[in-house]
């Protein structure tokens, strides 16, 4: 989820 970046929380979960 690096595309967003904003959603760092979800990004970490997604990997």
UniProtKB/Swiss-Prot annotation:
- State the superkingdom: Eukaryota
**Molecular function GO terms recorded:** ATP binding; phosphoribulokinase activity
Q: In which pathway does it act?
A: Carbohydrate biosynthesis; Calvin cycle
The record's family statement is: Belongs to the phosphoribulokinase family.
Q: What is this protein's name?
A: Phosphoribulokinase, 41 kDa subunit
Q: Which reaction does it catalyse?
A: D-ribulose 5-phosphate + ATP = D-ribulose 1,5-bisphosphate + ADP + H(+)
Source organism of this protein record: Selenastrum minutum
Keywords, alphabetical: ATP-binding, Calvin cycle, Kinase, Nucleotide-binding, Transferase
Coiled-coil spans are: none
């Amino acid at each position: 989820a690096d595309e967003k970046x904003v959603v760092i929380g979800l990004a970490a979960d997604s990997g």
